[in-house]
Amino acid sequence: MKILFITPYDNNYRYKSAFTKSLSYMPLTMPYLAALTPEEYGIECKAIDEGVQKINYEKLGFFDIVAITSVTSSVKRGYELAAFFKQKGSYIVMGGHHVTLMPDEAAEHADTVMTGPADRIWREFIKDYANRIPKKRYDGEHCDVGTANVIPKRELMQKSKYIFAPTVIANFGCTNHCEFCVINSFWDGKHSARKIEDVINDIRLLKSKYILFLDPSPTSNTMYAKAFFEALIPLKIKWAGLCTTDIYENEELFDLMIKSGCIGILMGFETFSEDSLQESHKKNKVEQYKAVVDKFHKNGVSVLGTFMLGFDGDTKESIMKMPDYIDEIGVDIPRFAILTPYPNTPVYRRLDAEGRITSRDWNDYDSIHATFAPKNFTARELEEMLVSVSNECYTLKRIWKRAVKNRYGGIIKLGVNLGFKTYNKKVAKTLGKDWSKKA
């Protein structure tokens, strides 16, 4: 039996330029699924990440099962691939964030749909398929996470296509309830995690000094986070990952994070408006932003901050002030995105009820297109402001100030900021073409 795992390409994905390609990190869904595949059936597995690979599928040959994992902005490509391989006689399985939130839609394209985590249901499906009784749908549960105790089969991936730091995930889900977040909807607001000893074993086997953690909210469960950071300390690795601003208020957890080897954090600040934070049920405190960043800097940690445009309280003036605010709080690398109402998230349901969803073309759900009607400007103006605020934030003067502001990672920060400046030009070009089509 042969299985092909595919992560589809989307319009704003990673195979775009030398810069975006250089930032590509290894996705773990396919290596995990391969590791979960029961060995007793003698199954041959192959994985394709369209974000970093160009493939001629006609030359691949036949696969008994084709498993496709998709986010919203890549799901249409996923459906195209499903149709292609179904025509060749393959059995199609689809899962991932979008499929979990829109299972009935996905069922129109796949023989089997999987929702939620696959730790238990993937093995169940393989056994059913081998016995010729596969179900149309399998629903995973958050409590399934970590029960399989497997090491991802990273050898299936083309490691040379990704950044030097291997990816690891320990925590899944998030207990916060941000209105716009697809993670919360996928995991139903629950926290799940692998056994700490399993993660440590995974890291040891990688034999790498640097690790990139993909955990969406690693400090959601404080007890787990403390134990995990303590277990990392003897490994003497350097790592980067995600974090929420509330880490500022937990001194013990923060100290353990630093001691465990943290050197870089991606943090979702989203907005400088307290009203917008309350609107989206985000727990950030604007008055703490600068103190949070300063605290990380004092401990040698660089901060990549993400910011979102399009909240109901946003105005043209408030958006265009963001570069100055960002410089004031000291973020090393800023990133902007348009508020995207992913299907069946709370913000999607609210905007849909208000009649404000303007596009259900999932290709547009890529964080650079406006798919809803903002309150204080048009969708086109919101897209234009994404370009304008990025241009202003990535002026050479601002980039240089960020690079030299503190002594840690200056050359890297300079390079990444310049890279995002170039990337923003590609975004502007993409949007410009779309505007021309609509004119």
Q: Which positions does each model-derived feature cover?
A:
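Structural recognition of alpha->loop->beta junctions
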Residues: 104-124, 256-266, 321-336
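Flexible glycine/acidic-rich beta-alpha junction loops that bind and position SAM and/or redox cofactors
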Residues: 10-14, 105, 223, 275, ...
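Residue-level recognition of beta-strand->loop/alpha-helix junctions
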Residues: 47-51, 69, 185, 217, ...
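Alpha-helical structural signal in soluble globular domains
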Residues: 36-40, 84, 88, 105, ...
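Radical SAM enzyme core and accessory elements
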Residues: 2-5, 17, 42-44, 62, ...
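Structural detector of well-ordered beta-strand residues that form the stable sheet scaffold
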Residues: 93-94, 114, 137-138, 240-242, ...
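Acidic, low-complexity intrinsically disordered segments
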Residues: 1-210
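Radical SAM [4Fe-4S] cluster-binding motif and immediate context
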Residues: 150-304, 311, 316, 321-324
